[in-house]
Amino acid sequence: MHNKILILGNGFDLDLGLKSRYRDFMFSSTWKEKKRPASILSCNLLKYLEEKNEIEAWFDAESELLNYALKITQGTYWSLQKTDRDGHEFFQAMLKKYLLKEQEEFIPNNDSIAAKLMEAVIQNGFFDEIFTFNYTDLNKTLAKFRLNTRINTTYMHGSLEDSDNIILGIETDEAIHKDYQFLFKTNSRFYRYNSLIESMESADEIIFFGHSINGMDFPYFKDFFIKQSKSTAELKRKYITIFTYDDSSDQQIINNFREAGVNLRDLMQRNNMTFIETKYLREREKFELKKWNDLLIHLKDDSKDTQNNNLRRLSSMLT
């Protein structure tokens, strides 16, 4: 085995110690003390988002963007507003400003499971690619832990780089008023999708850390998991590890699979699939510790096999 990918969600940044929830941003001084341009002072989209400031997860915030767009389309909410596009751009700009500051100032969590996993990944050269749904710079956040990765990293929803934009939007098959189609993630030139699908299909091993596999991002994964649960001659058995927070988040992912038509029993039988709950791992619960240690041993053994195969290949080229 040699093709491994790592997929990161906001739970990864939270585990590192960043305050990167939707609620963290909405109650931050960056947002609360903002100076809103006169052109969007009466923007209904921003008013709607502020009413939802108790939401924690970003996938819930994106669901509210979809609800807003549907209500406008169906004529059951505020009337169509030309300032909503500008308000959406302003919201993204302020979020980027907040995260840039948080990225620089956050206090690293010394008990971070995410950092321990990345240390193992870096030291053993486990992974070929990283796909992150976070906006933060992976190298800059890991630098707080004196870690540096040169693994090829794809920022699925844009990044905090000056040359990049962040993407906060929707995915839906439902009809949306044409004036609100700016909310579609696929309309952004920074949207990156195809490379993830191709990498997941060709990978031997996939690790998810802190991704809810839920909400607006679920279409990325739905077809993949359905395919992996079916018995076909072309099916490649994969090692799939999902790091989630606790029983509740674990169950939420399982429920998402069921609702999407994924046969969980077949998925488990036809793949080496493991859930690791970081809350109980941090509490050193024996069952989670065993799964964690088994994963590290497996990755190290597999890394050695790959290195040995590479050495044999090089040797054969010289003889």
Residue ranges and their predicted role:
Residues 1-5, 10-205, 211-319:
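Conserved catalytic-core helix/loop/strand module for nucleotide-ribose chemistry
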